[in-house]
């Protein structure tokens, strides 16, 4: 039993509470000797729990994590066609730089694959910063990669090369959803569907997603809270095979943390230009609050975030038995969880009570109430539980 009582929390605050550990900021030392190669350097990078390293030793360490993630699981076959997602975030630029470096090495060390770069334009208003100038700078720096752009919500045939792209106004379904939580979840699923369609269009067999440990920890908690527990393992795993057309999504930066990403940005003088989700953290949604919670943990208790993230590696993905045949959600492509279960029935029962209200008291018919709950559970049987929750927030129109 816990021996800490209320008296232990006096005017001095939580005396026995967990104390903040190492921050994620790290230290850049102006000059000194590298603890790994022994050479003098004008700038040393001091990561938490690692000795100070010179510019080249740090880059070798970070790039090894990228190569090790792909090599340990043998997830990327030789001469694979890869679609790399660049959204302007720091981690996406790090992944782009690492992949370009791996492709420009000698034959022995070269990563043997062909890469194309995709940017999904999700600007909701013309007043937002135009990403095209920054993308053109990246195209020149990382030649000969081909850069493609497509608008979120557009048809796949509207995919354009960066040099030929011009934005147009589209009618967005997410504006028809009542809550910000539902809108953000829908945009995430819509984005995944579009990525899979573009990969098929460009004949790419693999997609590189720039997710790091802290973002995957936030995604794990968010998926559980949204009712996606059956597919949470694939949401944070190195390999996700739910995209259409047997396209495989890979997360080769999953072992990098925020501190390593920021040091890499500084070392390579990269310029992130994304300001979308991170700027919305003041708006209340389940995703934003979870991200803020994990960011605070990462700042004060970095090892706790690692524990949350590593939990995802121990969760097995829920799969349909082979004899039952494939049965996936029409929106998120996860295995359907809409079978009759006590938990889902209880949720729909509660909703039915709220809907019937006074009529329930007048009729006093519990059988009708349970029948109503079963009908709700069996309706939209092509959607999983979480995607049905999105549909419930839809004011008009259709999700798909």
Swiss-Prot record:
Similarity section: Belongs to the CTU2/NCS2 family.
PANTHER family linked: CYTOPLASMIC TRNA 2-THIOLATION PROTEIN 2
Source organism (scientific name): Drosophila virilis (Fruit fly)
Keyword Cytoplasm: yes
Gene3D superfamilies linked: HUPs
MF term (GO), any: nucleotidyltransferase activity
Superkingdom: Eukaryota
Localization in the cell: Cytoplasm
Disulphide connectivity of cysteines: none
GO biological process, one term: tRNA thio-modification
Pathway in which the depicted protein is active: tRNA modification; 5-methoxycarbonylmethyl-2-thiouridine-tRNA biosynthesis
Role, per record: Plays a central role in 2-thiolation of mcm(5)S(2)U at tRNA wobble positions of tRNA(Lys), tRNA(Glu) and tRNA(Gln). May act by forming a heterodimer with NCS6/CTU1 that ligates sulfur from thiocarboxylated URM1 onto the uridine of tRNAs at wobble position.
GO cellular component: cytosol
InterPro entries per UniProt: CTU2 (IPR019407), Rossmann-like_a/b/a_fold (IPR014729)
UniProt keyword annotation of Aminoacyl-tRNA synthetase present: no
UniProt keyword terms in alphabetical order: Cytoplasm, tRNA processing
This protein's name: Cytoplasmic tRNA 2-thiolation protein 2
